[in-house]
Amino acid sequence: MSKSAVIGFGRGWDGREAARQAVQAAMAQLGSNHPALAMVFAGQEYSTADIVQAVSAQLGNLPLWGFSTTSPLSTDGEQPHSVGVALLSGNGYKAQVNWWPNFAQEGSNVATQFARSVRNQAVGVQGVLLAADGVNGDASLLCESIDQMNLHVAGGLASGDFRQGRTFCLGGNHSEGGALSALQLGGRLRLGLGMGHGWKDSGWLWKVTRARDVWVQGLDGVVPVKVFASALGYPKNEGAFPPLSEF
């Protein structure tokens, strides 16, 4: 069986319908190939529990990994208000999903458990995809564990409803906030990783001196709107109007 990777997107009134559409769109592209792994990118508008339930109902007991996001992406650009389901088919490789629901509360212990799970894999792990809670928890300890590993690791912090302070990770039949989900890949599989960003150095650098939850309230001891007004050349009293109000 030749390897094949596809992705389908779906939209609906709820997560179940959107996920059902996404799976069907992906399966149509696979043709006669059978999926061996599912990766799910859930729009923040939907219940991730509903999405996991719908995907599992259609695909059975496949390894499932994913996270919530403000907007899934495709080659055609952003796909807002949607669910994306990527399917990988083929043989000769291994995929295992590990799930830790207590990442936000016990970051140090989870980082240790993650490193141990990689070392204890019977089949050598060649690469790992990670998704961690994007609001709660400290990912720095996890990054320290990754630095000590001689393998490809990629991933990031889940996005979603930052106003409510809730982002979600998906792993197996689990879907919760405050969690860490790891997809371990091995066997006859070639992996390549690349990274880039569109930011340009502006020369501005400020230290966050005060914050509440996800809201920055102080930069170098100054209210952020005053900092941005000075940097962008706007009067401080225009903080309630664009573009200052957008920061």
Regions found by a protein language model. Give the residues of each.
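Small-residue-enriched flexible segments
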Residues: 1-58, 62, 67-71, 75-247
